[in-house]
Amino acid sequence: MINRNANRDRDRSRSNDKELKINYRIKAREVRVIFENGTQEVLSIEDAIKKAKEAGLDLVEVSPNVSPPVCKIIDYGKYKFHQEKRQKEQKKNQKVIKLKEVRMQPKIDAHDLDFKSKNILGFLKDGNKVKVTIRFRGRELAHTYLGYGILNSILEKVGDVNYVLESAAKMEGKTMFLIVAPKFKK
């Protein structure tokens, strides 16, 4: 007989492993208890839970891998709320940098080059890295110097923005590229 709920049960057990054990879910016989004022004491699990209940708080296992496990007497709901708030704050402060790519050919017109360099300028101001790619086809491969000239003119046009040349112009197969990144203030 096939157990159709096996995957669901396995997934539930995984999600419970990430959560902290509180009160009667703690399996150890003895625990090191850290009280609200910072003092520590090794107690039996029953005594520790009793002290937590007297204080109107929860016994939360914070470090299960040591012997005896370390537990804190705290308000679990408040603790979990502050943990989630801290994680959201860290996620909000995290800066995600994307790599944008601008493609062109060596036979690009001056107006098109201006338009592409304005796009590159916008990407850099938004805080994204930019990969400028020039694809050579057929006989154009004999004139790679045109690609270097185009890339240099783009760098001159983007010069008024603080940027770092992360990867200088180089050929790879039939394409020439360079990577430009914005300079961040520390």
UniProtKB/Swiss-Prot annotation:
Pfam families: IF3_C, IF3_N. Keywords: Cytoplasm, Initiation factor, Protein biosynthesis. One of its GO terms (cellular component) is cytosol. The keyword Cytoplasm applies. It is found in: Cytoplasm. PROSITE patterns: IF3. GO terms for biological process: ribosome disassembly. InterPro entries: T_IF-3_C_sf, T_IF-3_N_sf, Translation_initiation_fac3_CS, Translation_initiation_fac_3, Translation_initiation_fac_3_C, Translation_initiation_fac_3_N. Its main location: cytoplasm. GO terms for molecular function: ribosome binding; translation initiation factor activity. HAMAP family: IF_3. Belongs to the IF-3 family. Monomer. IF-3 binds to the 30S ribosomal subunit and shifts the equilibrium between 70S ribosomes and their 50S and 30S subunits in favor of the free subunits, thus enhancing the availability of 30S subunits on which protein synthesis initiation begins. This is Translation initiation factor IF-3. The gene is infC.
